Amino acid sequence: MAQESNENGWGDFLELCSKIKTPEAFHDFFALFLTFGERESMASRFLIVQALLAEQLTQREIAQKYGVSIAQITRGSNALKAIDPKFKEFLKNLNRKYGNQ
């Protein structure tokens, strides 16, 4: 029962996220639901994935540039390996579009 409730909660959370349209609203939303540490972890994960998608830096260079551990980079790399190739290409295109190469 608890797992079903959590799955419904996650789906509802994602649905609510899809309704947010401005960076300011996202900031307020995530400030409500995530601690400072969780937001910092999410920001680090974003930078790691962004750098991995750009394929311009080694893992060691990413670690030095962003002050993250090799283990964090490995987790990001493994997550990218596990996603659908079409979604990965979508992310790469977004990365290029917004000048984050």
Swiss-Prot record:
Q: Where in the cell is it found?
A: Cytoplasm
Q: Which Gene3D superfamilies match?
A: TrpR-like
Location, primary (coarse class): cytoplasm
GO: which molecular function terms?
DNA-binding transcription factor activity; sequence-specific DNA binding
One Pfam short name: Trp_repressor
Keywords attached to this Swiss-Prot or TrEMBL record, sorted alphabetically, are: Cytoplasm, DNA-binding, Repressor, Transcription, Transcription regulation
Q: Which GO cellular component does the record give, naming just one?
A: cytoplasm
Q: How does it assemble?
A: Homodimer.
Q: What does this protein do?
A: This protein is an aporepressor. When complexed with L-tryptophan it binds the operator region of the trp operon and prevents the initiation of transcription.
Q: Which family does it belong to?
A: Belongs to the TrpR family.
Identification of the protein by name: Trp operon repressor homolog
Name its species: Chlamydia caviae (strain ATCC VR-813 / DSM 19441 / 03DC25 / GPIC)
